[in-house]
C-alpha cells in the first residue's frame, strides 16, 4: 500500500516558511523577530507551554512574559461558538453551515463568532474543523466539520477563517490529521495512502493555510504509526514545507507524548501544558523543554522558531492593538461581564434556515397553508424540560437536538424549540395544535388521529468520545433514528393520512422504514440548527423562505452501502482510499436514497447554455511555495458557466454544482468530483448565470512518484447540475500535453 509521505525522510528540521508568505505574514514576522530578541529563555518557553488545565480563565492559557507587551494567550473552544461562557450565541453546527452552500453566510457566521471571541478577550478560537472529514458516516464528530467532500469543506474553511480573523481572533484549523473516529482516538493509527491523504484529508487544510489561518491543531491519533503531534513528516514536511504554513501548530489537549521528539518534529505549542490530573512527569515542555535546549537535544533555533510563529500570528490579526482583556472564566459558570451577542441571532437564524434540506415533498404538502389542526409529535419537538444546558457539554439526548455533544459545543443563551415556534405561528393562523411531546408510539398515534396533519420529530445524536450517551461512545452505534424513531413514525403514519417528518441529526440516517409509510408525504432534514432552531424551521415549512439547503453528504439505503464505518481496532488502514461518500457510490454503481448535493425547493430550475473556456497545460505544479502550496497550483486556468432559470411561481435559491471527471491518462480516479458551486437567488421567471473558475489544483491529482500535483492530459468531462446525480448539462474540454 502506498502510504502517506512515502518518499519523505525522517530527519527533523526547523522549517522557516515565512519568507514565502504574503505581505501580511512578512510584516508580522518582522515584528515577531524584533520581539523575540527581547525575551529571555524562560519567557520563550512560557510562550509555547500551557500553564496547565484550569490554570487560567480559558481552556488553554500561556504564560505572560514581562519583557514585551504580550498577554497570557487565551485559547477557547468551540467551532460553533464560545464554550463555557455566557451569554454567547449558539450558532448552527459546521455541518449545517456546509449545507447552506452559501459563501456569504459561511463568512458571516465566521465573522460573528470571531467578534464574540474578541469581545470576550479570547485570542484563539479553536475552530473551524476540517478533520474529521467524515469518511465514516457514523463518526462522532463529523457534525463539527462542514462536509465529507474536501472541496466543499475547503471553501467553508476558507470563508470561515477569513470571517473569524477579519474580526480579530486567531482561528485554529483542526484536527490535523486522520482523526476520523472517536473509538480508540488516543491510540489508533490512521494509515492513510499518500494520494488519498492529499486529495481528501489534506485538501481543506490547504484552503485553511491559503486563507491565512493563524494556527493548526494536531490530533490525538497516530498517522502511519507516528503520533500526529510528533510526526516530522506530517508537521515539518507536509504542513510547513509543502503547504508553506507560516503559523504555529498546537497540540490537542494532552495529545503530546514527548519533549524532544515533538519539538524537533514541528510542534510549536503544547496544550494545556500538563495532564488534566497533573500527575508527576506529565509536563513535557516547560522546564523540561528549557533543559532540552540547554543540553542541545532541541536546537535553540527550533525554540526561537516556535516563539516567532506564535508571535507572528498574534501580530497578523492585530491583537497588539487595543485587544480586550479576558472577560469571563470557564470555571465559575462562564458568566461574562460583557454581552457580545449583538445581532448575531439573526445570522444564526439565517444559517439554520438556509441549511434546511427538503428531502421529500409529495403532493405539495409543504409549505403549510394554515391547516385547521396540527399534531406535533416526539420529544425532539420540545426543549429539554430541565433546560437546554442541563447536561454538561450537551452530553445527553433529552428534548430537541440542536448541537451534538463534547468540546465542540456552546452554552445556549436560549433555544427556540420547534413546538414553541409552531405554536406561535399556529396562533396567528388559527390552527389548533395537538401536542404529544413524547416518543411513545401510542400517544403519538392518538395525537395524529385528532389532527389534519401530523409533524413527527426524530433525531440522531453523537459527539466526542469522553462522553457516552445512551451507549454511544462518541461515534454512533448505527444509523437508525434514536428513541425508536422508526416505530414512532410508523404509528403516526398508521393514524394519519398526512405526515411530515422532521429530522435533527448529526449526519445521515437510514430512512427506508419511514419512506415505506404511504402517509409520509414530506421529509425535512434540519440538522443541528443551534439556538434559532424552531424559528428557522417555521420560516421554511410555512413558506416564508423557500428551502435551499443541499446535502453535504450522501444518505444511503442501507448502512453497508457506505463501505466505511468506525472500526473496533487500533489500526485503520483506510482501505476505501479515494472512494468516500458519493465517490464510492458512483464508482460502485450503488444507488443512494438521497445523493450528495441533493435538496428540493418549492420552485423548479432549468439549466441551459453550458459554456467552457479552458487554457491549461498538462504537467506538474512547480511554482514557489506560498501559504497553501505551490503558487501555480492556485492559478485560474479556465472557466465554466451555465444559465439557471427559476421556472416556478415563487422566489428561490438554487445551488448550481460543477463536477469534473479526469481523463483516462490519470490513475484510477472517482468518476466525478465537486470542483465548483454557486448559490443563485432568483425571482420567478428570472435567469441567472453561475460561473465557476477552475484552478490547476481543480484539474490535478496527486502523483505519488513525483510527489507533486499533476494535471493529466486528455479529455476532461464537465458535469453541471442540481446535485451529484441530477446532472442538467454536460460538456468536455481537452488539456494538451505540455510543460
From Swiss-Prot:
Pathway per the UniProt entry: Glycan metabolism; cellulose degradation
Secretion signal, residue range per the UniProt entry: 1-17
Protein localization: Secreted
Enzyme class: hydrolase
InterPro entries noted in UniProt: Cellulose_deg_GH3, Fn3-like, Glyco_hydro_3_C, Glyco_hydro_3_C_sf, Glyco_hydro_3_N, Glyco_hydro_3_N_sf, Glycoside_hydrolase_SF, Ig-like_fold
GO biological process, one term: glucan catabolic process
Primary localization class, coarse: secreted
One protein family per Pfam: Glyco_hydro_3_C
Disulfide bond residue pairs: none
E.C. numbers: 3.2.1.21
GO cellular component, one term: extracellular region
Catalytic activity field: Hydrolysis of terminal, non-reducing beta-D-glucosyl residues with release of beta-D-glucose
Family: Belongs to the glycosyl hydrolase 3 family.
Name this protein carries in UniProt: Probable beta-glucosidase L
Species, as recorded: Aspergillus fumigatus (strain ATCC MYA-4609 / CBS 101355 / FGSC A1100 / Af293) (Neosartorya fumigata)
Gene: bglL
Amino acid at each position: 500500500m502506498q502510504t502517506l509521505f512515502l518518499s519523505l525522510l525522517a530527519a527533523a528540521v526547523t522549517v522557516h516558511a515565512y519568507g514565502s508568505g504574503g505581505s501580511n505574514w512578512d510584516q508580522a514576522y518582522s515584528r515577531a523577530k524584533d520581539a523575540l530578541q527581547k525575551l529571555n529563555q524562560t519567557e520563550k518557553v512560557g510562550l509555547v507551554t500551557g500553564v496547565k488545565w484550569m490554570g487560567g480563565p480559558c481552556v488553554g492559557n500561556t504564560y505572560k512574559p514581562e519583557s514585551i507587551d504580550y498577554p497570557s494567550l487565551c485559547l477557547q473552544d468551540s467551532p460553533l461558538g464560545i464554550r463555557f461562557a455566557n451569554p454567547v450565541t449558539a450558532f448552527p453546527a459546521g455541518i449545517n453551515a456546509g449545507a447552506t452552500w452559501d459563501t456569504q453566510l459561511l463568512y458571516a457566521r465566521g465573522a460573528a463568532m470571531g467578534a464574540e471571541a474578541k469581545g470576550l478577550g479570547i485570542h484563539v478560537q479553536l475552530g473551524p474543523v476540517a478533520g474529521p472529514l467524515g469518511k465514516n458516516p457514523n463518526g462522532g464528530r463529523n457534525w463539527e466539520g462542514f462536509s465529507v467532500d474536501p472541496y466543499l469543506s475547503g471553501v467553508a474553511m476558507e470563508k470561515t477563517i477569513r470571517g473569524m480573523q477579519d474580526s480579530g481572533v486567531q482561528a485554529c484549523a483542526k484536527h490535523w490529521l486522520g482523526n476520523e473516529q472517536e473509538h480508540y482516538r488516543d491510540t489508533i493509527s490512521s494509515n492513510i495512502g499518500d494520494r488519498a491523504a492529499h486529495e481528501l484529508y489534506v485538501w481543506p487544510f490547504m484552503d485553511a493555510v491559503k486563507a491565512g489561518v493563524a494556527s493548526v491543531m494536531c490530533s490525538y491519533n497516530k498517522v502511519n504509526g507516528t503520533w500526529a503531534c510528533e510526526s516530522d513528516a506530517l508537521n515539518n514536511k507536509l504542513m510547513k514545507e509543502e503547504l508553506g504554513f507560516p503559523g504555529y501548530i498546537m497540540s490537542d489537549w494532552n495529545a503530546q507524548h514527548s519533549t524532544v521528539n515533538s519539538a524537533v518534529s514541528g510542534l510549536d505549542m503544547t496544550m494545556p501544558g500538563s495532564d488534566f490530573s497533573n500527575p508527576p512527569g506529565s509536563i513535557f515542555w516547560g522546564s523540561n523543554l528549557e533543559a532540552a535546549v540547554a543540553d542541545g537535544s532541541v536546537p535553540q533555533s527550533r525554540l526561537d522558531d516556535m516563539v516567532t510563529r506564535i508571535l507572528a500570528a498574534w501580530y497578523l490579526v492585530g491583537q497588539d492593538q487595543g485587544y480586550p482583556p479576558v472577560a469571563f472564566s470557564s470555571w465559575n459558570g462562564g458568566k461574562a461581564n460583557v454581552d457580545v451577542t449583538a445581532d448575531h441571532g439573526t445570522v444564526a437564524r439565517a444559517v439554520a434556515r438556509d441549511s434546511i434540506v427538503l428531502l421529500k415533498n409529495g403532493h405539495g404538502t409543504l409549505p403549510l397553508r394554515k391547516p385547521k389542526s396540527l399534531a406535533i409529535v416526539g420529544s425532539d419537538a420540545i426543549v429539554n424540560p430541565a433546560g437546554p444546558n442541563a447536561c454538561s457539554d450537551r452530553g445527553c439526548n433529552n428534548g430537541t437536538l440542536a448541537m451534538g455533544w463534547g468540546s465542540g459545543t456552546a452554552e445556549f443563551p436560549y433555544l427556540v424549540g420547534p413546538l414553541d415556534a409552531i405554536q406561535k405561528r399556529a396562533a396567528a393562523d388559527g390552527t389548533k395544535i395537538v401536542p404529544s411531546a413524547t416518543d411513545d408510539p401510542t400517544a403519538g398515534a392518538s395525537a395524529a388521529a385528532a389532527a389534519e396533519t401530523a409533524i413527527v420529530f426524530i433525531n440522531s445524536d453523537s459527539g466526542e468520545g469522553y462522553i457516552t450517551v445512551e451507549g454511544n461512545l462518541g461515534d454512533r452505534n448505527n444509523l437508525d433514528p434514536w428513541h425508536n424513531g422508526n416505530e414512532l413514525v410508523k404509528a403516526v403514519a398508521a393514524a394519519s393520512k398526512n405526515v411530515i417528518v422532521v429530522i435533527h441529526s448529526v449526519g445521515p440516517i437510514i430512512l427506508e422504514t419511514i419512506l415505506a409509510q404511504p402517509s409520509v408525504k414530506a421529509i425535512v432534514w434540519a440538522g443541528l440548527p443551534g439556538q434559532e432552531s424552531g424559528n428557522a424551521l417555521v420560516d421554511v415549512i410555512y413558506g416564508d423562505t423557500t428551502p435551499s439547503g443541499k446535502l453535504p453528504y450522501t444518505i444511503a439505503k442501507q448502512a453497508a452501502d457506505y463501505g466505511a464505518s468506525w472500526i473496533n481496532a487500533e489500526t485503520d488502514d483506510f482501505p476505501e482510499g479515494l472512494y468516500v461518500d458519493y465517490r464510492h457510490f458512483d464508482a460502485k454503481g450503488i444507488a443512494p436514497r438521497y445523493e450528495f448535493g441533493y435538496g428540493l425547493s418549492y420552485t423548479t430550475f432549468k439549466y441551459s447554455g453550458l459554456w467552457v473556456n479552458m487554457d491549461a497545460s498538462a504537467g506538474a505544479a512547480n511554482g514557489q511555495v506560498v501559504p497553501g502550496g505551490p503558487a501555480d497550483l492556485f492559478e485560474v486556468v479556465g472557466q465554466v458557466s451555465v444559465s439557471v432559470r427559476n421556472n416556478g411561481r415563487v422566489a428561490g435559491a438554487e445551488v448550481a454544482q460543477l463536477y469534473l471527471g479526469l481523463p483516462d491518462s490519470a490513475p484510477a480516479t472517482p468518476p466525478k468530483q465537486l470542483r465548483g458551486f454557486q448559490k443563485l437567488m432568483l425571482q420567478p421567471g428570472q435567469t441567472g448565470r453561475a460561473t465557476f473558475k477552475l484552478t490547476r489544483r481543480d484539474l490535478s491529482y496527486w502523483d505519488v512518484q513525483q510527489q507533486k500535483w499533476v494535471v493529466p492530459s486528455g479529455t476532461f468531462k464537465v458535469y453541471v447540475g442540481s446535485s451529484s446525480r441530477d446532472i442538467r448539462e454536460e460538456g468536455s474540454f481537452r488539456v494538451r500535453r505540455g510543460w
